[in-house]
Regions:
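Structural micro-motif
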Residues: 122-125, 139-147
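Positively charged n-region of N-terminal signal peptides that target proteins for export
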Residues: 1-5
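Short active-site neighborhood of thiol/selenol oxidoreductases, capturing the structured segment around
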Residues: 50-73, 93
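N-terminal "domain-start" segment that seeds a small globular fold
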Residues: 23-52
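Loop/turn elements at helix/coil->beta-strand transitions in domains of secreted/extracellular proteins
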Residues: 56-60, 88-92, 121-125, 151-154
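Thiol-/selenol-based redox modules, centered on thioredoxin-like
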Residues: 148-183
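Hydrophobic membrane-insertion alpha-helices, especially the h-region
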Residues: 9-20
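Structural microenvironment flanking redox-active thiols in thiol-disulfide oxidoreductases
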Residues: 73-120, 128-136
């Protein structure tokens, strides 16, 4: 009886995982795929909704994050450093603030997000992705996640996880940014 129960539970888990994967769109997580357009309508630190089509000839780094995520907030100084270092050389960083579901800790509130941006010294544009349109379009699963888009609008690199100014991951992302800026 225990074996039968284990088989049934195992089968149920496989079906749930397979069903979840089937519901989610097949989305680029590797280079060579055109970047899905941003359809977010609520923006902070930008006087209008940004569209990737407007940013051709610029390298774009998308940062999927949420202000209650410790890994995300510890990565912010690295992103602020990239913004200061490369903004005038052709890099645009866009934060995509994607709250958890169900609403948690006021993450869906635009005022709370605005205060978090000020508190963390973030001046680059941020889209509020409460409905997870960008999150789903890019196939994101973890906070923080990053997508690096070249000047032609093609995804070249994607990854996730916390990194800090001057650690190995920071240097690797820095190298990739410089490479795309030089193309």
């Amino acid at each position: 009886m225990k074996i039968r129960t284990a088989i049934l539970v195992g089968t149920a888990v496989v079906l749930v995982v397979a069903g979840t994967a089937a519901i989610r769109p097949a989305v680029p997580r590797r280079g060579g795929t055109p970047a899905p357009e941003l359809t977010n309508t609520s923006w902070l630190n930008s006087d209008h909704p940004l569209r990737l089509a407007e940013l051709r000839d610029r390298v774009v780094l998308l940062n999927f994050w949420v202000f209650t995520c410790g890994n995300c907030t510890r990565t912010v100084p690295s992103l602020v450093a990239y913004d200061r270092k490369y903004r005038d050389r052709g890099l645009t960083i866009i934060g995509i603030h994607t709250p958890e579901f169900p609403p948690y800790a006021g993450e869906h509130d635009k005022g709370n997000l605005a205060r978090a941006l000020v508190r963390q010294g973030i001046t680059y544009p941020n889209a509020q992705d409460n409905d997870r349109h960008a999150w789903d379009a890019y196939g994101i699963r973890y906070w923080p996640s990053f997508v690096l888009i070249d000047k032609r609008g093609i995804i070249r690199y994607a990854g996730y996880g916390e990194f800090h100014v001057d650690d190995g991951d920071y240097r690797e992302w820095d190298r990739r940014i410089r490479q795309l800026l030089a193309e």
